């Protein structure tokens, strides 16, 4: 038995074969998928402890030459440029440039960013915070809270992609 364990250990850590490489990948995947990810979920209080941004809804740049419904052939990416095009919506909904400038992740997220999450506490969620929630699609949505209100003892949040 001891000899078998030694051979297995040697195969995983010292063998240079493709089979050793593949075995390491499979074991790493299984450990992350069934131990690390659930443990993180338990500690952070969420079923999605790690998510990747898969859409451009929180980016502050152009996509297909469009940003906030306006077409640009060139767009200098900066907070001021973003606000000059998209800020009108926020201002018409009671959010000033100064307020937005103090929001967490004021520059949004880029497609491909990886985010570590923890369970939100509804008692301290406010306009400007970023929420990740399950919509009608299988992928979770990442949007910014733009309005909070109570109705019939229920708290509601309006969210918007930047």
Predicted regions and their residues:
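Protein maturation boundaries and topogenic segments
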Residues: 1-111, 119-122
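Short coil-to-beta-strand transition motifs
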Residues: 47-48, 134-144
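Flexible glycine-/small-residue-rich
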Residues: 55, 135, 159-161
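Short, charged beta-turn/beta-strand-edge "cap" motif at the junction between a beta-strand
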Residues: 120-125, 136-139
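Extended, hydrophilic extramembrane loops/domains of integral membrane proteins
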Residues: 146-162
